[in-house]
Amino acid sequence: MNKIVVLGAGMVGRAIAIDLAKKHNVVSADICEESLKKLEAIENIKTIKSDLSNKKIVKKIIKDSDLVVNAAPGFMGFETLKTIIESGKDVVDIAFFPEDVLQLDDLAKKHKVTAIMDCGVAPGMSNAILGYHNTKMIVEDFEFYVGGLPQIRTLPFQYKAPFSPIDVIEEYIRPARFVENGKTVIKPALSDTELIEFENVGTLEAFNTDGLRSLIKTMKITNMKEKTLRYPGYIDQIKLLKDYGFFQTKEIEIDGKQIRPIDLTSKLLISKWKLEDDEPEFTIMKIIISGIENDKKVKYIYELFDKFDTKTQTSSMARTTGYACTSAVELVLNGNYTEKGLFPPEFVGAKNDCLKKMLAYQKDRNIIYKVSRKEN
């Protein structure tokens, strides 16, 4: 059995550890005792309470591992990934940090490491699917819509998060990049709001976020965009908080103490946005790829609708993100993907039967991507 270290035991990190423990010996490391306790009784999982912001501690934990999963919070994700690579360990990453991860490619090559980044549901599977089709056709347009939402809508936000609010807020303050007529366009996050109908849910609200990430640099496609999905009305609440400075990252003084408004906001929202372990929720995604295939105008549509798993008590967002990650872990361990360097999922999807294997792996866990093809 391989030894795999999962750094981070949040809702997604736990799902990853539990899934991998079916075949491997797993070490789960986190500073939160409450999160680690939920893993203690599971066979093949060892828990370690540790400060993952400490480089020396991380190096010690992963020293004798065969592969590492970086599921640390986004604010420490880049430095954690860098430490893993410097330690010469293969890694699959879902930290989704704001830094440009592609700058670590040379470092990964130097240490002869296979590093797969951003390998969740989106970014992640959305990238892998595009990467695959980009080898089979001339892609002209790529767009996708994605969101994770609670089944029970509670005002004012009608939203719950499986991860830290500060990571969610980061999506709302980071400028959104997309491609229009072959040129990169930058707009504020939360812009270009539109209402879209979905079969299983009804009307949802879509808005710009910076979800294309590596695709901006790696894919030469005329038009590309990504939008986040929420219940209608959510965007107005978020814009109000943003306009009044609640997401401000510059410190302000209150009674002689310096604080960042974003930290206070995140702390206050934890109780309101906390997704309970048994709370019903769903993940929804629609990917549209249009272009020329065998001299014909074609359109591929991938649709995902996944719900909270009542049998395993696992959230849909943890499942769809976590099992995308573990499917990539198996690709590396089984020798299906052996390239050395740092690779976004679009490169993985373009390789051999990697996308097919990732989809099959997730289908075994009842995560099903419905695919349709239309000729114009």
Give short role names for the model-derived ranges.
Residues 4-8:
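Conserved N-terminal Rossmann-fold NAD(P)-binding element of oxidoreductases
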Residues 94-117:
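Rossmann-fold NAD(P)-binding glycine/threonine-rich loop
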Residues 52-64:
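Conserved Rossmann-fold cofactor-binding substructure of NAD(P)-dependent oxidoreductases
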Residues 67-84, 97-101:
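Beta-loop-alpha module in the N-terminal Rossmann-like domain of NAD(P)-dependent dehydrogenases
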Residues 43-54:
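Rossmann-fold cofactor-recognition segment
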Residues 13-14:
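N-terminal Rossmann-fold NAD(P) dinucleotide-binding loop
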Residues 32-35, 98:
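Helix N-cap at the beta1-alpha1 junction of Rossmann-like dinucleotide-binding domains, i.e.
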Residues 135-376:
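C-terminal catalytic/substrate-binding lobe primarily of soluble NAD(P)-dependent oxidoreductases
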